[in-house]
């Protein structure tokens, strides 16, 4: 039995209240963005490991939510890529992915030297997110990800222990029509991805779109045929 359940187009996976429009002034470091809100300069936490060059740059539009952080009172939630808004907060990925799984899963399952996002029966499921789309191709990663490559190797090795591994991509960009690993940004991940898929790691690619303050399921896509 598949570990996944089907959702229809337009299924709402997450909704936020009272998001705040902002404009980026600068990216202070990997996790902090300086921005303007109603002519006031504020600092916001960016909980996204990606490089995000296409989204986080001076003058671009983002949406923030109020938080009770120790250092910052705002968190970046959505960023605009020139076409549409994308989700840029990794804290919500697991919750969104879980809405496409049958009941009975375990979160943060420890296997070998890693924690895999989900275990469901014999299925190991690792979740990654993607916002970069070029020529209708969803591309991951947007920066070198040693952690992502390591997870692929762990999934591949799990087959010999009787597991059925999946890598699941949540693509928060409705322009995506197919998926390809981003060889230009990370050739090691790309090569490992193709090797893993060829040798028994299954893949799943779910596309989402954002309207107002809510995220909806759009469609499932396949790998690009180059």
From Swiss-Prot:
GO terms for molecular function: DNA binding. InterPro entries: SfsA, SfsA_C, SfsA_N. It comes from the Archaea. PANTHER family: SUGAR FERMENTATION STIMULATION PROTEIN A. Belongs to the SfsA family. NCBIfam families: sfsA. This is Sugar fermentation stimulation protein homolog.
